[in-house]
From Swiss-Prot:
Essential cofactor(s): a divalent metal cation
Keyword NAD: no
Name by which UniProt lists this protein: 7-methyl-GTP pyrophosphatase
GO biological-process terms attached to the record: nucleotide metabolic process
Highest taxon above the source species: Bacteria
Main function: Nucleoside triphosphate pyrophosphatase that hydrolyzes 7-methyl-GTP (m(7)GTP). May have a dual role in cell division arrest and in preventing the incorporation of modified nucleotides into cellular nucleic acids.
Native source organism of the sequence: Burkholderia mallei (strain ATCC 23344)
Reaction catalyzed: N(7)-methyl-GTP + H2O = N(7)-methyl-GMP + diphosphate + H(+)
Cell location: Cytoplasm
Active-site residues annotated for this sequence: 79
Amino acid sequence: MQHHACSPPRLILASSSRYRRELLERLRVPFDVVAPEIDETPLPDETPCATALRLAAAKARAAAERARAPHGALVIGSDQVATFDGLQIGKPGTHARALAQLQAMRGRDVEFHSALCLYDSRSGATQSEDIVTRVRFRTLTDVELDAYLRAETPYDVAGSAKSEGLGIALLDAIDSDDPTALVGLPLIALTRMLRAAGYPLFGAPAPAADGVNGR
C-alpha cells in the first residue's frame, strides 16, 4: 500500500472480532484487520480497569509489530473486562460455566470496562481511555437462560451475553456514556482520539494533532 505525504495514515484494527469490525465500518474509513497474539491473563491484584487498559495497549502494539507498516499506522486496540460482586468475570468457555454466570447475575448489576488504545506507530504516542458501562440483567428462568445459550453460544464473551445479538433480551437496563462500548469498541471515544491524532474522519483535515497523551 502506497502512502503519500498528504495521505492519512494507515488505520489498523487490532482485533479478530467480527463485531468490532462491523462497528468500525460505521465510520466509513478504510482500515486493515490484524489479529494480535498476546497473553490476556490478568496480573495478580490488578484492577479491572488496569487489566482492560493494559491489554488494549498490548493488542495495539502487538498488531503494529505484526503489520510491518513501513510508513507507520494508527492502530486501534481494545479490550473488555466484566466485573460482578467485585470480581472479574472471565470468558466462560463452556455451556455449564456460562449458565452458572447468567444464573448468578440475574436481577443484578454488572460493570463492563471497555478499554480503548490508539497507538501511533510513527511517533510511539498513545491515547487510552476506559469506558464503564453498567448493565442490569433481567430475572429469567433457568429454561430461558439455557435456551439463550444454546441459540447464541456466547462462550467466548465475558459475561456470557452478546448485547449486539439476542443477548440484549437478557438485559433490563444499560447505563453508559457510549452506546457502542458494551459491544467492545467505543466509537465516541475512538472518534475523539482519531481527531486528536489528526485523522480526517470526514474527509476534511482535522486540527493539528495536539494534546495526545502518553498513557
